[in-house]
Amino acid sequence: MQPSTIQGWLRTLADLAPTYRKVVFTNVSTIFTAAVDDELIPKNPCKAASVRRPRSDLKKIVPWTRERVLAVRNELPERYRLVAWHGAGLGLRQGEIFALSPDDIDFETGEVQVRRQVKLFGGNAQVFGLPKGRKVRKVPLPGAVQDAITAYMTVHPPLDVSLPWNVRGGKPTTASLLLTSREKKALNRNYFNPFIWRPALQRVGVPDERENGCHALRHFFASTALHEGETIKAVSEYLGHADPGFTLRTYTHLMEDSAERTKRAIDSVFGANAPESTTHEDGST
């Protein structure tokens, strides 16, 4: 199999959606990588320099407004309202929200360690696992979120939940979870999304569309942090992205125009209100 063969094959996929083309290409490349590992072929033709890897058609993120976040939060049943705080205030993914424990929170230093998620294995079997990308990270704990967690725990004490680790039948692992179901189990997205999240959206008048899933809270966190001047590198670390470049590509349109920042910076030096320097006869200032 030659790189030119891959190039020709990719041309036959030109009419498919960019994201789907990328998924198909990635799957084929994975097969070739396995063949290389098994010494069946010398090289992966998909990784040749002449082969242009398909790119996803990234849609521009339109972050929720503060008013929408608060409205959806208030429409969630009281038992599940903390979901909004964890998503919009900490930038957690849904599985990480479901797996957060008070043991992960340092209330003294104001820091949260994101070290597990609840994920589904083989359809509906719940397991604990590392966060996406197998990447444990630390996230700052804002005072408002800390207050919400503290108040929530006085009404809903954390509960110990045991799940297999990473795979069905994996080593049983117990964590004290902040959020649990009425049956005292870990929250399951197959129940939470259709029966808790979407009804809240409906009551607020938010369209039940993919971009309005729980991930919208995470986008709100990122857009708010960037708007307030946080760096892409820091936001990338808080979100658990493996590549800051991905964070930049996803959220760059939400960042303040660099030209405006530059103009303000120069105006602060040479503008009407800037102090004038005194030039001496020898040319010094």
Predicted regions and their residues:
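Short, basic (Lys/Arg/His-rich) helix/loop patches that form interaction surfaces
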Residues: 18, 71-81, 90, 139, ...
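Basic, Lys/Arg- and aromatic-enriched nucleic-acid-binding interface segment
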Residues: 18-26, 35-100, 108, 119-120, ...
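Generic recognition of well-ordered alpha-helical segments
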Residues: 8, 26, 30, 143, ...
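N-terminal core-binding DNA-recognition domain of tyrosine site-specific recombinases/integrases
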Residues: 1-40, 58, 185-193, 206-216
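C-terminal secondary-structure termini that scaffold catalytic or DNA-interacting sites
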Residues: 74, 109, 120-145, 150-151, ...
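Short, polar N-cap/turn motifs at the start of nucleic acid-interacting alpha helices
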Residues: 104-111, 230-252, 260
